[in-house]
């Protein structure tokens, strides 16, 4: 039974038992900033378990893509060296949110393993939490599990919690017995660390809530969270002991071996690379790009580890990107996003490998030199840090190499150097706090801005300097909270609205609108009278500004769709700022857009504007929205009910912002800038509507002025400038020829001033009225005509000197270098051993310094 068939059998089994199949969530968690990567099936349901979210279903099943590399859950250093450690794995899981509990969960697990997959019951071992008598009775009395294959374990192994407080509960685990020929004892025994008994399924029963004092309270609706590693299960079904022997891994391993010559299929490096192509490809699919921090740095570490192992196997570089197609062969049916992103993944992997290969050989040589000279078993932290800082070696890559040779690293010294570097970096950065910061508010505002730009409302909260007050007087800055408001609070990249709050004998100018908890907070200044609590006011949004923002926001959606069409489906929005005068859009991409791409994008967006499609908004549940093809933004957290914005069949995105009624309202779209802001992140700045027209007119005005200056017409500008550049190039050639002739004459004139000292031809000469370029030409002429020469030429003007020195290559090492001669004469300068240049104030003892140079030559 193939891995793909096992995955599908699991999902089919639970569909037949009323479970909703939920697609694997991104490897980048959207609901947990403390988590580097999704590392378990329950991550996407965390808010459900915490009671912060509800869904339309109470039973779910998933095949979740997981990564454990970096952070608390880091398997990287063991990958390839053990039978079951991976950076990437699939976790099969079934979940109950207040529906079924222990009995059904246990029955489902046992039935699937023994009746669907036909695993002999006598090869399975079960553990429960020692105080969970209910689960024990279900296993022993109802499932008829033999007491000889059953054990009770303590809290460390069989009690799960989400944190120090919150939902928690006992768990029961199912192990597979690989047989007495494999070392190791049963779970809970002193020999349990062996490989004979391998955990394949963990069933967590969340039935308690732990308070701050550590007391457990029964939850009103207990839940079930289960997880089973597909790779481990496949090893059991396929009768192999190591996960790397299952069908999907073997396909990859053979594909890697084919890239080299005479490679042993059991080589550890093949396992490392096979694992790493999985994690790297799926991380890139989910929007992670190699960088020097956070998730991007973990990806970079994994790629570089794979490249190093490829180097160890003698694979011709670049090789890693060639494994994307074999990965698609085994996983593309289950995860079509791999197929859609194939070219993007290959491009990123090839680019990253090429970049690292340039320093890999140098770093390896440096490391091997230090290993040869080691007097003990420890590599210094300084060497490890140099490999990291100069050659791009992640510390775990260095540790890998060191471990293979039975050595270790002085990690304390390495960590101290890393800390020093972090402190220096932090000292160079200054941050300011947001003046809008306020304490958490209990107030709640109802937003009506989708359908209204003005309305009557009542003041339910007033703030000054972050504190609640009862009134705000004329001239004072503060913030106002209304029970109902048409003002849009900054969110999703769209800036907050501005406008006026007008009451009887008072008014408040709104300069910004933000969301704090459930309250919409209007920041600004009282420009008339006094504002007090419970005052009735008229809220009026600046509709001209709002309309301009609408156009820009709708245009960002068209831009996003156009980028995917022109640049590639790998493009993901990474941020935006939608203001009235202009907007910016950040997106994932690995290189600058070329002029042709920018022009194509503008043409596509403006074509959609001319189509004048209606901008349609629908409210639906998140799963229906995703199934309809709506684009969900990278890393964004969504509630169960979402707004889906559609423009014909060209763009469909989840969005809570305000938008134009039709695409034609935008009028005109222009890209005014495109540049990189971080590794793998590009930014487009754009204008629309009347601001786009103003920008175009500004550019036309500039062209007209330039044409007038050059005495031509705007249509002939390109031809005129090309001719000017050609004329300039010809003049530069003529100047270069004249300089060369002048240098030849100058060189010929001073050849007679050469002194021969011990076989070395020395020339030190002050030149009058000669510029630097001519002086360099003269030096080249002299060096080409004089053998074994030390030549120093200098000019003096307004007490400043310019010096150039040259040393024939056949005497380098016998005489002072050219750079040393320049510094000796004028104190400043640098260059190569055979040619250097410098300058500065004329030294008072210039003649003495010239004499000292002669003495240096005489002493050779």
Curated annotation (Swiss-Prot):
Family from the record: Belongs to the class-II aminoacyl-tRNA synthetase family.
CDD domains: AlaRS_core
Protein name, entry field: Alanine--tRNA ligase
Subcellular location(s) of the protein: Cytoplasm
Free-text remark on how the cofactor is bound: Binds 1 zinc ion per subunit.
GO molecular function: alanine-tRNA ligase activity; aminoacyl-tRNA deacylase activity; ATP binding; tRNA binding; zinc ion binding
Cofactor: Zn(2+)
Enzyme class label: ligase
NCBIfam families (alphabetical): alaS
Organism: Legionella pneumophila (strain Paris)
Record lineage: Bacteria, Pseudomonadati, Pseudomonadota, Gammaproteobacteria, Legionellales
């Amino acid at each position: 039974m193939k891995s793909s068939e096992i995955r599908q059998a699991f999902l089919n089994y639970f569909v037949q038992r009323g479970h909703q199949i939920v697609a694997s969530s991104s490897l980048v968690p959207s609901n947990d900033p403390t988590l580097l990567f999704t590392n378990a099936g329950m991550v996407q349901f965390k808010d459900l378990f915490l009671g912060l979210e509800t869904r339309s279903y109470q039973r779910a099943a998933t095949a979740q893509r997981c990564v454990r590399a970096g952070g608390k859950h880091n398997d990287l250093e063991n990958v390839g060296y053990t039978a079951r450690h991976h950076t990437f794995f699939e976790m099969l899981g079934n979940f109950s949110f207040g529906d079924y509990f222990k009995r059904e969960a246990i029955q489902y697990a046992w039935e699937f393993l023994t009746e669907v997959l036909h695993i002999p019951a006598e090869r399975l071992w079960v553990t429960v939490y020692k105080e969970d008598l209910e689960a024990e009775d279900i296993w022993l009395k109802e499932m008829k599990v033999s007491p000889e294959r059953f054990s009770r374990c303590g809290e460390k192994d069989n009690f799960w919690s989400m944190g120090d407080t919150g939902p928690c509960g006992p768990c029961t685990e199912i192990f597979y017995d690989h047989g007495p020929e494999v070392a190791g004892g049963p779970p809970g025994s002193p020999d349990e660390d062996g490989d004979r008994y391998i955990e394949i399924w963990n069933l967590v029963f969340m039935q308690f809530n732990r308070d701050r004092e550590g007391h457990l309270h029964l939850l009103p609706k207990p839940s079930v969270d289960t997880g089973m590693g597909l790779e481990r299960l496949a090893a059991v079904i396929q009768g192999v002991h190591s996960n790397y022997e299952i069908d999907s891994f073997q396909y990859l391993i053979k594909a890697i071996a084919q890239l080299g010559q005479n490679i042993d299929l059991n080589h550890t490096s093949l396992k490392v690379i096979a694992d790493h192509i999985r994690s790297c490809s799926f991380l890139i699919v989910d929007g992670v790009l190699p960088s020097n921090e956070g998730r991007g740095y973990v990806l970079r570490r994994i790629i570089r580890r794979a490249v190093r192992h490829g180097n160890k196997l003698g694979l011709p570089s670049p090789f890693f990107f060639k494994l994307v197609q074999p990965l698609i062969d085994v996983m593309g049916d289950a995860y079509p996003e791999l197929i859609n992103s194939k070219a993007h993944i290959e491009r990123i992997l090839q680019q990253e490998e090429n970049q690292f290969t340039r320093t890999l050989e140098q770093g390896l040589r440096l490391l091997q030199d230090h290993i040869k000279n080691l007097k003990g078993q420890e590599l210094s932290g300084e060497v490890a840090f140099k490999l990291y800082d100069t050659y791009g070696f992640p510390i775990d890559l260095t540790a890998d190499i060191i471990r293979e040779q039975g050595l270790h690293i002085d990690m304390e010294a390495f960590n101290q150097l890393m800390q020093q570097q972090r402190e220096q970096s932090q000292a160079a950065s200054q941050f300011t706090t947001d003046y809008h910061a306020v304490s958490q508010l209990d107030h709640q505002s109802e937003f009506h801005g989708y359908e209204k730009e003005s309305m009557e409302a009542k003041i339910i909260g007033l703030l000054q300097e972050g504190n609640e007050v009862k009134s705000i007087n004329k001239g004072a800055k503060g913030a106002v909270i209304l029970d109902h408001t048409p003002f849009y609070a900054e969110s999703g990249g769209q800036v907050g609205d501005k406008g006026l709050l007008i009451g009887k004998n008072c008014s408040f100018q709104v300069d910004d609108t933000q969301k704090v908890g459930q309250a919409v907070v209007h920041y600004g200044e009282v420009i008339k009278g006094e504002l007090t609590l419970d005052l009735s006011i008229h809220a009026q949004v600046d509709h001209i500004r709002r309309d301009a923002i609408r156009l820009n926001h709708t245009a960002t959606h068209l831009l996003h769709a156009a980028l995917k069409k022109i640049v590639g489906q790998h493009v993901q929005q990474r941020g935006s700022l939608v203001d009235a005068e202009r907007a910016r859009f950040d997106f994932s991409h690995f290189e600058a857009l070329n002029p042709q791409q920018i022009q194509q994008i503008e043409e596509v967006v403006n074509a959609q504007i001319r189509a004048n499609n209606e901008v349609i908004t629908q409210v639906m549940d998140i799963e229906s929205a995703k199934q309809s093809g709506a684009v969900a933004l990278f890393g964004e957290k969504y509630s169960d009910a979402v707004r889906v914005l559609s423009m014909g069949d060209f763009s469909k995105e989840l969005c809570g912002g305000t938008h134009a009624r039709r695409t034609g309202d935008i009028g005109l779209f222009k890209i005014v800038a495109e540049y990189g802001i971080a590794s793998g992140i590009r930014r487009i700045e754009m204008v629309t509507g009347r601001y786009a027209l103003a920008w175009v007119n500004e550019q036309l005005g500039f062209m007209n002025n330039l044409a007038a200056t050059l005495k031509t017409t705007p249509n002939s500008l390109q031809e005129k400038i090309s001719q000017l550049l050609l004329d300039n190039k010809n003049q530069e050639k003529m100047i270069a020829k004249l300089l060369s002739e002048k240098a030849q004459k100058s060189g010929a004139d001073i050849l007679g001033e050469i002194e021969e000292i011990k076989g070395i031809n020395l020339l030190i000469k002050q030149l009058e009225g000669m510029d630097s370029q001519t002086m360099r030409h003269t030096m080249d002429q002299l060096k080409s005509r004089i053998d074994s020469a030390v030549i120093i030429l200098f000019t003096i003007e307004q007490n400043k000197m310019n010096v150039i020195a040259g040393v024939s290559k056949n005497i380098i090492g016998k005489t002072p270098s050219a750079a040393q001669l320049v510094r000796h004469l004028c104190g400043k300068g640098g260059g190569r051993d055979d040619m250097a240049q410098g300058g500065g104030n004329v030294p008072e003892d210039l003649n003495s310094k010239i004499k000292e140079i002669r003495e240096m030559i005489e002493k050779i």
